[in-house]
């Protein structure tokens, strides 16, 4: 799982400023993302279940083509219906115990955490495959984001002996990703660093190899 978290792209139709979500996703897959989470939320997102399912299936097919895990944000019913590779939920989404009861053994389970105690609880549950920690930096992609934690939270979680795979979340781009990895994350998740880039190949190359020339 750790290797799959290296460059973890998150997006929904609301994040796309040029082209289409499938078009941007395929470019990112060609460029080397290691995981994709379909997150359809907020202003400008698809509103009907049928639209979301149709888009999810199109994205899932692209991920399968490039052998990259396809994860759905929050929508357990949709993830189970289409056989997603994983489900990711936040502290305020569907209760994690309910998600575990529905999904354990069928797909990977990811959980967002914002503190050492939440990370410890995720590990104690035994069925969470990885945790998303953040927001590390200020983010424009999530209107209801928690307060910014900085990279210190990653160091604190690792010092506490928590061994779950970690992906850093929130305001991460090719210029600051090295800090996130150095602090203890196994990978970085990005939205706008890819969706708002004119050259996602360069961005993803730098995310995979921090410090490499663009």
Swiss-Prot record:
Cofactor field: Mg(2+)
Keyword annotations of the record: Magnesium, Metal-binding, Thiamine biosynthesis, Transferase
Any one Gene Ontology cellular component term annotated for this protein: cytoplasm
Catalytic activity: 2-[(2R,5Z)-2-carboxy-4-methylthiazol-5(2H)-ylidene]ethyl phosphate + 4-amino-2-methyl-5-(diphosphooxymethyl)pyrimidine + 2 H(+) = thiamine phosphate + CO2 + diphosphate; 2-(2-carboxy-4-methylthiazol-5-yl)ethyl phosphate + 4-amino-2-methyl-5-(diphosphooxymethyl)pyrimidine + 2 H(+) = thiamine phosphate + CO2 + diphosphate; 4-methyl-5-(2-phosphooxyethyl)-thiazole + 4-amino-2-methyl-5-(diphosphooxymethyl)pyrimidine + H(+) = thiamine phosphate + diphosphate
UniProt-listed PANTHER family: THIAMINE-PHOSPHATE PYROPHOSPHORYLASE, THIAMINE-PHOSPHATE SYNTHASE
Binding site for 4-amino-2-methyl-5-(diphosphooxymethyl)pyrimidine: 37-41, 73, 112, 142
Pathway(s) where this gene product acts: Cofactor biosynthesis; thiamine diphosphate biosynthesis; thiamine phosphate from 4-amino-2-methyl-5-diphosphomethylpyrimidine and 4-methyl-5-(2-phosphoethyl)-thiazole: step 1/1
Alphabetized NCBIfam families for the sequence: thiE
Molecular-function GO terms, alphabetical: magnesium ion binding; thiamine-phosphate diphosphorylase activity
EC number assigned by the record: 2.5.1.3
Protein name: Thiamine-phosphate synthase
Sequence positions that bind 2-[(2R,5Z)-2-carboxy-4-methylthiazol-5(2H)-ylidene]ethyl phosphate: 139-141, 171, 191-192
Annotated binding of Mg(2+), by residue: 74, 93
Biological processes annotated in GO: thiamine biosynthetic process; thiamine diphosphate biosynthetic process
Gene: thiE
Cofactor info, note text: Binds 1 Mg(2+) ion per subunit.
Homology family: Belongs to the thiamine-phosphate synthase family.
Entry function: Condenses 4-methyl-5-(beta-hydroxyethyl)thiazole monophosphate (THZ-P) and 2-methyl-4-amino-5-hydroxymethyl pyrimidine pyrophosphate (HMP-PP) to form thiamine monophosphate (TMP).
Pfam families per record: TMP-TENI
């Amino acid at each position: 799982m750790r290797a799959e978290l290296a460059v973890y792209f998150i997006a929904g139709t609301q994040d796309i400023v040029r082209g289409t979500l499938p078009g941007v996703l395929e470019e990112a897959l060609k460029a080397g993302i290691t995981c994709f989470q379909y997150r359809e939320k907020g202003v400008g997102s698809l509103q009907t279940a049928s639209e979301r399912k149709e888009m999810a299936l199109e994205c899932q097919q692209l991920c399968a083509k490039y052998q990259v895990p396809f994860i759905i944000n929050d929508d357990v019913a949709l993830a189970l219906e289409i056989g997603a590779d994983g489900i990711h939920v936040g502290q305020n989404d569907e209760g994690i115990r309910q998600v575990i009861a529905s999904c354990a053994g069928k797909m990977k389970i990811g959980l967002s955490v914002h503190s050492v105690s939440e990370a410890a609880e995720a590990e104690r549950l035994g069925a969470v495959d990885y945790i998303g920690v953040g927001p590390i930096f200020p983010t424009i992609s999530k209107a209801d984001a928690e307060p910014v934690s900085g990279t210190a939270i990653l160091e604190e979680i690792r010092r506490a002996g928590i061994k779950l795979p970690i992906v850093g979340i929130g305001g991460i781009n090719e210029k600051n990703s090295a800090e996130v990895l150095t602090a203890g994350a196994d990978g970085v998740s990005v939205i706008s660093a890819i969706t708002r880039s004119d050259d996602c190949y360069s961005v993803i190359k730098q995310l995979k190899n921090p410090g490499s020339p663009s």
